[in-house]
């Protein structure tokens, strides 16, 4: 894949391919920071260096490795492709790193799974919209998550909006607790990463009231956002409604208002991949069965969205009643509870096993500190080439048995170095425009 090319692989097809070609033996050429450079994020030796001077709380290495990208900005490269890069004045010097052995054995770390939380309305079919209409629709109440991912495949500018109609018995109070969108663009990985960074960044709740029978867009910004031909739009909204609301995701002419268009709009047929539907309990908690001890447990991993250890969610397409499968668990919010113990520090990485990957996540510490993590932190995407690999029978058997190899060429995104006193809690969701599965890797920090 070249930076100047547009990524036009359907979202569902990317995830499905990643599940069929799931290499733990990763030997693709590295496109992101080298593993040696990432290994440099080791804890300082002194106790004073492990304390934040302004708060006195424990300082994990995420404060160093991710601070440089906290104020990420868009910068145009010479080939016209936009990449997330840190400001030069905020780049941190890289310490010398110890050489990692060529390969190491990894073991699957046992976790318990619990599903609960919001109802997901997932709109990704038709992914390439060739006519105006309703892309997805359902009626919900309570905690709701809406994810939409669509490309304007028409010759004229369009808008995409989420429209609410109060069909309940009285006035509804609608509270948006979290949201994230990417600016429409033909560069899909840029859109995907920006949407995730926005979703996982710190934000305050927003609230409005919807009278009985009233129709309005979920976010006024949708009415001001135009998609040029070929542009992708991608957004995720978490909200709560005290009354039943009919939710419609629509694509419509740029010169019209969403409520006006909705009066005569019809539901568009799904495409062949049929990746749309309503999925209850869209929050998934993966909780380790025991705390990880870097002094005794070696290198371990937790696989995400592989449809084996972490099964895809099933739902219903409310427009026709058909059963659907969420290939990739897009829109599922993962709560990763992976405590550590012992006196030594633990290094955490995210690694893309399915191919090209551009995303973000969030970490919460017992001290109350929270931080946005870009994956990868130093460029828009990584993992190029891993989706072209196939598994040998031996590797497939090893993976089924919970074994893998951490090789010298595996691409890793540093998501922090933690001590038992600062055990992390991660929020993760599969990013649109990226390939799956992905893995969280835990290993002893380099001394």
Report each predicted region and the residues it spans:
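Short, flexible helix-coil linker/hinge segments at the edges of structured domains or between repeats
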Residues: 181-210, 214, 256-267
């Amino acid at each position: 894949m070249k930076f100047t090319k547009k990524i036009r692989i359907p979202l569902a097809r990317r995830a499905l391919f990643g599940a069929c070609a799931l290499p733990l033996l990763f030997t693709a050429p590295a496109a992101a920071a080298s593993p040696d450079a990432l290994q440099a994020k080791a804890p300082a030796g002194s106790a004073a260096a492990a304390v934040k001077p302004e708060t006195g709380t424990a300082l994990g290495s995420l404060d160093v490795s991710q601070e440089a990208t906290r104020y990420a900005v868009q910068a145009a490269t010479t080939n016209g492709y936009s990449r997330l890069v840190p400001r030069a004045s905020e780049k941190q010097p890289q310490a010398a790193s110890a050489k990692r052995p060529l390969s190491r054995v990894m073991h699957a770390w046992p976790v318990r799974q619990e599903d609960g939380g919001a109802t997901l309305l997932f709109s990704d079919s038709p992914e390439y919209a060739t006519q105006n209409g309703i892309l997805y629709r359902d009626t919900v109440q309570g905690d709701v998550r809406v994810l939409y991912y669509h490309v304007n495949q028409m010759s004229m500018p369009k808008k995409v909006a989420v429209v609410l109609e109060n069909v309940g018995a009285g006035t509804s109070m609608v509270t948006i607790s979290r949201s994230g969108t990417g600016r429409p663009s033909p560069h899909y990985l840029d859109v995907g990463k920006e949407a995730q960074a926005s979703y996982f960044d710190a934000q305050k709740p927003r609230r409005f009231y919807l009278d009985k029978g009233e129709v309005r867009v979920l976010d006024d910004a949708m009415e001001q956002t135009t998609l040029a031909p070929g542009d992708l739009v991608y957004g995720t909204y978490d909200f709560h409604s005290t009354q039943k609301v009919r939710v419609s995701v629509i694509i419509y002419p740029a010169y019209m208002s969403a409520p006006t268009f909705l009066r005569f709009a019809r539901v568009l047929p799904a495409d062949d991949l049929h990746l749309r539907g309503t999925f209850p309990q869209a929050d998934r908690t993966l909780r380790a069965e025991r705390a990880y001890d870097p002094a005794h447990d070696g290198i371990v991993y937790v696989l995400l969205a592989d449809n084996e250890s972490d099964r895809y969610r099933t739902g219903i397409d409310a427009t026709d009643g058909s059963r659907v499968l969420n290939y990739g668990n897009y829109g599922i919010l993962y709560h990763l509870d992976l405590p550590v113990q012992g006196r030594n520090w633990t290094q955490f990485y995210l690694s893309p096993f399915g191919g090209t990957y551009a995303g973000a996540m969030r970490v919460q510490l017992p001290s109350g500190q929270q931080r946005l993590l870009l994956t990868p932190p130093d460029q828009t995407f990584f993992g190029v080439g891993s989706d072209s690999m196939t598994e040998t029978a031996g590797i497939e058997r090893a993976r089924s048995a919970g074994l893998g190899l951490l090789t010298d060429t595996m691409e890793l995104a540093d998501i922090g170095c933690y001590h038992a006193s600062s055990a992390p809690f991660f929020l993760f969701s599969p990013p649109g425009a990226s390939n799956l599965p992905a893995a969280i890797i835990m290993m002893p920090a380099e001394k």
